[in-house]
Amino acid sequence: MPTFVDRVVLHAAAGDGGHGCCSIHREKFKPLGGPDGGNGGRGGNVLLRVDSGVTTLLDFHFHPHQRAGGGRPGQGSNRHGADGDDLVLSVPDGTVVLSPDGEQIVDLVGAGSTYVLAHGGRGGRGNASLASARRKAPGFAELGEPGEQLDAVLELKSVADVALVGFPSAGKSSLVSVLSAARPKIADYPFTTLVPNLGVVQAGDHRPFTVADVPGLIPGASQGRGLGLEFLRHIERCSLIVHVLDCATLEPGRDPLTDLDVIEAELAAYTTDLSDRPRLVVLNKVDVPDAAELAELVTPDLQARGLAVHQISTASRHGVRGLALALAELVASLRAAVPSPAATRIVLRPRAVDEPDFTVRAEGDGFVVGGTKPLRWVRQTDFSNEEAIGYLADRLARLGVEKELAKRGAFPGVAVTIGAVTFDWEPTLSGREALLAAGGGDGDGYGEAGYGAVDTAVTIATVGGSGGTRAGARGGAVVSDLPLGPRGTDLRLRTSKRLTRAQRTALSDSADDFDDGAGFSDSAAFGDSGGSGGDADGGRG
């Protein structure tokens, strides 16, 4: 079973928003209590937070699917649902969040650094929040918005000041054990170290620094031999690279200079350019017979390359203290050379006033509407409720979607897709006005001839049975077989004029004449009626 994992694929799902409640207040002696449905709660977020006590991504290796809590639904009596609980995932310092395509999203460095990986969905509004002067008792509520779901790749890049690189069994783990209190596994066979080991070194009065022991490299590591270059990501943040060279190796064809050239070639093959990092050479195992002579022999050549050289023995601890002090001074100078981070500058880019909140594009035989608002509205609409559908149509019309569709040549009945929902577009009253302005609708019952070139919207009434059909159009035009919009919409009644008592009486008399068989030639009545009697329910206004 693995004990160290530095790369995982995380499947994060934020909580869904709670549904709004559709409720009417019921109380003794209050016949018109009004709507009192509460709002749904917000869905929980999925957050990543750096925890200094976490050193591996092992938890996400066994539990890659993480889901936050959902919001609770609203209830009657104006009771709002509780928000969903946020899910906080603890990650090691130095965790990099990548998209599945490899694009870096965020780099989490420093204890307490937090990033919201997936946002919870909005809670749906209850009918109490949807009430208006025209819609005093909505018979619907909004659905909760689904939370975000995404896949992310988490990679751990150790945050260390010094990286120890070299061949297997060169003594890197032993050096970490004598420099710090770390106790990595040490044995006399290659590839004992399979995962990076970190140790904190305190040398003299200098600030502590961190040393990382990277698993051994061999020729061809860039092509995947040995452990490959898989763990070299852990030295990307290091400010100093230390080559640990074995002066006591008995393998043929190996010596400190050859080992140095091989390791440098493998580092050059790594994707990240490490050529700007300062180098330091440690000649290890000088306590072994003939190893000290070899160290003295190669030291001038190494110094000629501009490299600082230290001869040590981790077994006898010869030269270890001097090496620790030298490393501490180098790290301190490198830290001082790093410019202090500038304060984060927040740039505000306000959206232009005339910039639309949506997009409309033609696709195939229909149109596709995009934009944050239309997509969110569709997700929060209960399509089993006709009044909710009418409310959605009104919102889209007020946003300008219907006018834009008319400009692009849309006609009634064309397929319009918003998100995962496809509609057969039937314009509302304002949408028909836009069609008239655009000159569209010829031959389909919605053109100028059908409307009589009127400036206001048309409302109709249909009488079933033997009474036949009748239609009333403001402005004197007669239109038949035009579909009504959904009941309860604002735009159906937007152009209705408030009538005087005499006008309402005249309309009532006209309806009576029609019931007596006198016919109905020119009227502004509005309503639905059925049966052979043609009982009209008109005069709404």
Curated annotation (Swiss-Prot):
Domain OBG-type G: residue ranges: 160-332
Catalytic class of the enzyme: hydrolase
Molecular function via GO: GTP binding; GTPase activity; magnesium ion binding
CDD domains in the record: Obg (cd01898)
Subcellular location field: Cytoplasm
Binding site for GTP: 166-173, 191-195, 213-216, 284-287, 313-315
Superkingdom, natural source: Bacteria
Domain Obg: 2-159
NCBIfam families, alphabetized: Obg_CgtA, Obg_CgtA_exten, PRK12296.1, PRK12297.1, PRK12299.1
Amino-acid positions noted as binding Mg(2+) in the UniProt annotation, renumbered to this chain: S173, T193
Role of this protein: An essential GTPase which binds GTP, GDP and possibly (p)ppGpp with moderate affinity, with high nucleotide exchange rates and a fairly low GTP hydrolysis rate. Plays a role in control of the cell cycle, stress response, ribosome biogenesis and in those bacteria that undergo differentiation, in morphogenesis control.
Gene from which this protein is expressed: obg
UniProt similarity note: Belongs to the TRAFAC class OBG-HflX-like GTPase superfamily. OBG GTPase family.
Domain OCT: 350-427
Subunit structure: Monomer.
GO CC term, one of those recorded: cytoplasm
Composition skew (Gly residues), residue ranges: 528-541
UniProt-listed Pfam families: DUF1967 (PF09269), GTP1_OBG (PF01018), MMR_HSR1 (PF01926)
Main subcellular location: cytoplasm
Protein name: GTPase Obg
Annotated region described as Disordered, given as residue ranges: 63-84, 497-541
Entries under PANTHER family matching the protein: DEVELOPMENTALLY REGULATED GTP-BINDING PROTEIN-RELATED, MITOCHONDRIAL RIBOSOME-ASSOCIATED GTPASE 2
Species in which this protein is naturally found: Parafrankia sp. (strain EAN1pec)
